[in-house]
């Protein structure tokens, strides 16, 4: 009898324990489901707020995006136009600015030719004395010609011809002497230097425009 009562009590205790476990497990499941639902609602609300903010920013930035797209298209058109210009310049070789002419002298070898620098030949001007002598010579020639034409006798013609030839030779010799004096005064270069002239393209931001000054022969000799 006691054994039967003990078994009944044990069975009732086990049944209560099982029911408590089931109820606790059901409560934990329901709590976890509620937490999951709360998390889902939070994520959905956060996603909705993010979408709303993005939509607002997109609506605000639509004119800016349109402006940027328009400016980018204009820049692309400008770049395309500049490329066409560059192609034309490369095709026709049109200089962008006035190039500088640079004369490069060719250096001669010293063992086969004397190196002399070419100078501009400046002939000296005639003075008053030289002009007066030339005028006197011309007057004498005209006087001799007039005297020879006026004479009629043969003997006088022969004598006049001889004197005329002598005077003409003297005039020629005097003119040659004057030319010789001026040729010694003038500077004549024995050999002319060969100058190769070519076109050199230089950039305007790294080149200073320098013009070659003309050298005066008289100043060079005085120095």
Swiss-Prot record:
One of its GO terms (molecular function) is zymogen binding. The modification Phosphoserine is found at residues 23-25, 28, 46, 71-73, 132, 147, 155. Keywords: Milk protein, Phosphoprotein, Repeat, Secreted, Signal. GO terms for cellular component: extracellular space. Mammary gland specific. Secreted in milk. Sequence repeats lie at residues 76-128, 129-223. It is found in: Secreted. InterPro entries: Alpha-s2_casein, Casein, Casein_CS. It comes from the Eukaryota. Residues 1-15 form the signal peptide. PANTHER family: ALPHA-S2-CASEIN-LIKE B (PTHR16656:SF5). Belongs to the alpha-casein family. Important role in the capacity of milk to transport calcium phosphate. This is Alpha-S2-casein.
């Amino acid at each position: 009898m006691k054994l039967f009562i003990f078994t009944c009590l044990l069975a009732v205790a086990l049944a209560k324990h099982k029911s408590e476990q089931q109820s606790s497990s059901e409560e934990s499941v329901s709590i976890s489901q509620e937490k999951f639902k709360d998390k889902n609602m939070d994520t959905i609300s956060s996603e909705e707020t993010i979408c709303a903010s993005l939509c607002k920013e997109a609506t605000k930035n639509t004119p800016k995006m349109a402006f940027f797209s328009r400016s980018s298209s204009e820049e692309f058109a400008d770049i395309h136009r500049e490329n066409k210009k560059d192609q034309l310049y490369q095709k026709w070789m049109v200089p962008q600015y006035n190039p500088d002419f640079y004369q490069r002298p060719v250096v001669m070898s010293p063992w086969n030719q004397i190196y002399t620098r070419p100078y501009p030949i400046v002939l000296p001007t005639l003075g008053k004395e030289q002009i007066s002598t030339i005028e006197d010579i011309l007057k004498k020639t005209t006087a001799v010609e007039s005297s020879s034409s006026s004479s009629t006798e043969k003997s006088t013609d022969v004598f006049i011809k001889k004197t005329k030839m002598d005077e003409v030779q003297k005039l020629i010799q005097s003119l040659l002497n004057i030319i010789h004096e001026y040729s010694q005064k003038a500077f004549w270069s024995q050999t002319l230097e060969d100058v190769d002239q070519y076109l050199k393209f230089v950039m305007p931001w790294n080149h200073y425009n320098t013009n070659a000054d003309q050298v005066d022969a008289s100043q060079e000799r005085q120095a």
